[in-house]
Swiss-Prot record:
GO molecular function: tryptophan synthase activity
Biased composition, class Basic and acidic residues, residue ranges: 12-26
Name the record gives this protein: Tryptophan synthase beta chain
Organism: Prochlorococcus marinus (strain MIT 9215)
InterPro entries listed in its UniProt record: Trp_synth_b_CS, Trp_synth_beta, Trp_synth_beta/beta-like, TrpB-like_PALP, TrpB-like_PALP_sf
Length: 414
């Protein structure tokens, strides 16, 4: 069940919404828990990013490439048949989709990969590494490396390679070297760990294009800021389409980059509800889920303090989701902070609920969403019956489902 929204749960001050702090903290979360070897690289990256955003030529080049190469701005689409499906006697949920699935490479990931590639060039780094789970960040990184002539190495868990063979081929076709990670659970967590080990060993020549709003400062801020174009466009498009800000923003959350990209320009617009949806896998009361915010506790993973799935001894537990992109036992520190202060709400849906929603959206709107995105759509089943009035809901359609066809075909009786 979804709890009825109440502003009594909000306990933040103005400064709580102006994050991170100078030392890279979102409240008590974030920070830099890394080997000394990486501290100069993190400082260099923070300085490069700060200077880049002040450089009109950098911003002009980024915006030009977002338009001509990525295909921005992406449409805000009115999902009329979904609206009809979810309307009740009390309320009509007017559902809008922010179509990040229409970006070049098929997801939101290209926004950040492009921006960080430009930063790497500014820093003189010609070797790029990245981690990937669903393969979309890997494809986006391989794409921008091909565009700029940069050497590209992608770390990917063996389990995810089985689930995402199409994206593995795409990365190789784009000229990237895909390194298989067999350690641990052979999923996104382990791929990230291997990428960090590579970076420690090759820090002088290499830039790590981290794919989510996780990791040590300044990565959560850098990734968020490159994805904020999603929310900035959404704000403008909502005013153009229906003359007001949306009532609710809805996005799936693994590490949390697509959600933060949508949420960030609205964080100080406190009339707008922000809802993130995690992967409940086989159920949050089982040991097979990735609902970090729902069930996690404070710990340190991949250089950052945040909420984690861990046992009583602080050992990181295995996450599970049918969606490779949500199959991660941590979450970005800003999400943990927004949850703590009550500015954002978080729930979870199971594998089966996500599959059912993928099929529903496909049949009603002619749009096949990614399994990750389908978790956000599935939350409509829980949210819409609670609405007391007509409500504008914007869902971040973070990626398309082409990559998931084999997984879905084996799970749905079609």
């Amino acid at each position: 069940m979804v709890s009825t929204f109440s502003r009594k749960n909000q306990n933040y001050k103005k400064d709580d919404l102006n994050q991170p702090s100078k030392d890279g903290r979102f409240g008590k979360y974030g920070g830099q828990y890394v080997p000394e070897t990486l501290m100069p690289a993190l400082f260099e990256l923070e300085t490069a990013a700060s200077n880049a955003w002040k450089d009109k030529l950098f911003v002009k080049e980024l915006n030009h490439l977002l338009k001509t190469y990525v295909g921005r701005e992406t449409p805000l689409y009115e999902a009329k048949r979904l609206t009809e499906y979810y309307k009740t006697k009390k309320a009509i949920p007017k559902i809008w989709l922010k179509r990040e699935d229409l970006n070049h490479t098929g997801a939101h990931k290209i926004n950040n990969a492009l921006g960080q590639a430009l930063l790497a060039i500014r820093m003189g780094k010609k070797r790029i590494i990245a981690e990937t789970g669903a393969g979309q960040h890997g494809v986006a990184t391989a794409t921008v490396c091909a565009r700029f002539g940069l050497k590209c190495i992608i770390y990917m868990g063996a389990e995810d390679i089985k689930r995402q063979s199409l994206n593995v081929f795409r990365m190789k076709l784009l000229g990237a070297e895909v390194k298989v990670v067999n350690s641990g659970t052979a999923t996104l967590k382990d791929a990230t760990s291997e990428a960090i080990r590579d970076w420690v060993s090759n820090v002088e020549s290499t830039h790590y294009i981290l794919g989510s709003v996780a990791g040590p400062h300044p990565f959560p801020k850098i990734v968020r800021d490159f994805h904020a174009v999603i929310g900035e466009e959404t704000k403008k498009q909502c005013l153009e389409s229906f003359g007001s800000l949306p009532d609710i923003l809805l996005a799936c959350v693994g590490g949390g980059s697509n959600a933060m990209g949508l949420f960030h320009p609205f964080v100080k617009e406190t009339s707008v509800r922000l809802i993130g949806v995690e992967a409940a896998g086989g159920g949050v009361d089982t040991d097979k889920h990735a609902a970090t915010i729902t069930k996690g506790s404070v710990g340190i993973l991949h250089g950052s303090m945040s909420l984690l799935l861990q046992d009583d001894n602080g050992q990181v537990q295995e996450a599970h989701s049918i969606s490779a992109g949500l199959d991660y036992p941590g979450v970005g520190p800003e999400h943990s902070h927004l949850k703590d202060i009550g500015r954002a709400e978080y729930g979870s849906v199971t594998d089966q609920e996500a599959l059912d929603s993928l099929r529903l959206v496909s049949e009603l709107e002619g749009i096949i969403p990614a399994l990750e995105t389908s978790h956000a759509f599935a939350w409509l089943d829980k949210l819409c019956p609670t609405l007391e009035k007509d409500t504008h809901i914007v869902i971040n359609c973070s990626g398309r489902g082409d990559k998931d066809v084999n997984t879905v075909a084996s799970s749905l009786d079609i």
